[in-house]
Amino acid sequence: MCTNIVYEWLKALQLPQYAESFVDNGYDDLEVCKQIGDPDLDAIGVLAPAHRRRILEAVRRLREQDAAAAGLYFTLEPQPPPAPPGPSPLAVPTRRLGESCGGPSQGPRGDPRGQTTAPRGRELVSYPKLKLKIMIRDKLVRDGIHLSKPPYSRKVPMAGILEFLMNWPKSSQNR
């Protein structure tokens, strides 16, 4: 059986019998599960009306929690640079040599994230937030790192930090 967050979520809904179908249909993360609708439940094989209602209600709660906690997450994609203060917005933009009329080249969905840069012979790649999250989680599991256990979750005493910072110039002179 699968042991992931979707299984735990379905277990909490008292519907663990659908876990394998969810994973087989690509719903292996809660971010993906937030997109579930009636056609998806048909494909997964959730036919009982009570089960469908329970899952759709849980999906609605996931979306609400995501909207409520939106300020708690980092944005992993680069932000577009702010518009420089200057000429009025009615000014005609100038083109650079080799640039099409539409402006700088865009990614496949019309956003600049699809662009890659090649400094020093290495190509930089941008990953979507969900894929990057999964890659990081898998790497932590492969390396045996548990962020919920010491030393990663150990509380740092503030008094010790403050004392160190107060004595820092003295300790650096002793070297």
From Swiss-Prot:
PROSITE patterns: SAM_DOMAIN. SUPFAM superfamilies: SAM/Pointed domain (SSF47769). GO terms for biological process: regulation of intracellular signal transduction. Residues 75-123 are annotated as: Disordered. Residues 78-90 have a biased composition (Pro residues). GO terms for cellular component: cytoplasm. It comes from the Eukaryota. It is found in: Cytoplasm. InterPro entries: SAM (IPR001660), SAM-SH3_domain_protein (IPR051725), SAM/pointed_sf (IPR013761). Residues 1-65 form the SAM domain. Keywords: Cytoplasm. PANTHER family: SAM-DOMAIN, SH3 AND NUCLEAR LOCALIZATION SIGNALS PROTEIN RELATED (PTHR12301), STERILE ALPHA MOTIF DOMAIN-CONTAINING PROTEIN 5 (PTHR12301:SF8). Interacts promiscuously (via SAM domain) with EPHA5, EPHA6, EPHA7, EPHA8, EPHB1, EPHB2, EPHB3 and EPHB4 (via SAM domain) (in vitro). This is Sterile alpha motif domain-containing protein 5. It comes from Bos taurus (Bovine).
